[in-house]
C-alpha cells in the first residue's frame, strides 16, 4: 500500500507505517496543484495530511482510497467530494487533547493576569504595575470549563 504524507509528520509515525509494510512517500511541501500531481504520479492509495487542504482536484487526480487527517476535524478535506468518489476520510481525534488542555489553562492564566493588555501597554512604553497587579489568581477557586 502506498502512503503519501503531504505535511510534516513524526518520524516515528513514518517508521511505524514502514514496519507494517507500507511504501511511504513523504513530501511536507505539497500544496494545491503539486499535491494533485504527486497523488497522480505516486499512485498513492492513502493520503495523510495535517493542515494541507485537500480539494476536489486533488481527490480526482489519482486512485486514493483513504484520506487521513493527522489531527482532529475534517476542515481541510473536501469530504463531500471524497464521498462522491468512494474515498474514505478519517481523522485522529483526541491526539492533541493534552496540548489543547495545556493551552486552555495558559489562556485562563493570561486572562486572569491580563497579560495581553499588559504587553500592549509595555510596547507603548507604559508600566502600569498597579493596574496589572490585580490578578485574582486561581488558588482556592472553583473553575468551570464549558466545551462545545
Language model segments and positions:
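Phosphate-binding beta-alpha-beta segment of Rossmann-like dinucleotide-binding domains, i.e.
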Residues: 85, 93-142
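Hydrophobic Val/Ile/Leu positions in short beta-strands of Rossmann-like dinucleotide-binding domains
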Residues: 5, 143-145
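Glycine-rich Rossmann-fold phosphate-binding loop(s) that bind the pyrophosphate
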Residues: 148
